[in-house]
Regions:
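An N-terminal amphipathic alpha-helical segment
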Residues: 58-75
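Low-complexity, rRNA-contacting terminal tracts
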Residues: 1-59, 81-196
Length: 196
């Protein structure tokens, strides 16, 4: 049975450590660290993932690579007196995922664009790298597109800040349904945050 190019790319990215040569991966990470934190790119690194999430090679669709620090929340030190163990600085887990933080930072940098979706492309000891698909709702080619035209409506403005992307829905627990998900809908707040 003949397999498509997308299938081959997807198989490669299932185990990137085994599939991508180590020297090439090290050079790529070094280059990405030198790039700006939010860096516009010509085409996606993972074509299969980008296409699966709605990417099209057309005007009005913008690709951005960004990096976010790995690990738990970084909190500034408190000058008021207290036991070091009670400062609440270490081992604090964010309520948002790192992927969601990346999407929001990119959206703040591009206020005229809407975040469609994002996917992981790599990580090193300090950073995680994501590629984010942005859409220009005012572009005629997007307004006339059958698959992407929905994003031009006013009700989708600022969708990333309201947890409407895939990463946002996962953080709100909306990827779960059935038994155990009773306190997630209509929202966590409506259930007094007893759902997470």
């Amino acid at each position: 049975m003949a397999r498509s190019l997308h299938h081959a790319v997807r198989e490669t990215w299932k185990r990137p450590k085994d599939s991508i040569p180590r020297d090439y991966h090290r050079e790529r990470m070094a280059q990405w660290r030198r790039d700006p934190v939010i860096n516009r790119i010509e085409r996606p690194t993972r074509l299969d993932a980008a296409r699966r999430m709605g990417y099209k090679a057309k005007q009005g669709v913008v690709m951005v690579r960004t990096r976010v620090r790995r690990g738990g929340l970084r909190k500034s030190k408190i000058n008021m007196k207290r036991k070091p163990s009670k400062m609440g600085m270490l081992k604090i887990t964010m309520a948002k995922s790192i992927k969601r933080i990346a999407e929001e930072r990119v959206a703040r940098k591009s206020p005229n664009l809407e975040v469609l979706n994002s996917y992981w492309v790599g990580e090193d000891g300090k950073n995680k790298f994501f590629e984010i698909i942005l859409i220009d709702p005012s572009h005629p080619s997007i307004q006339n597109d059958k698959q992407l035209g929905w994003i031009t409506k006013n009700r989708h403005t600022g969708r990333v800040y309201r947890g409407k992307t895939s990463a946002g829905k996962r953080g709100r627990g909306l990827h779960n349904k059935g038994k155990g998900a009773e306190k997630l809908r209509p929202s966590l707040k409506a259930n007094l945050n007893r759902g997470k």
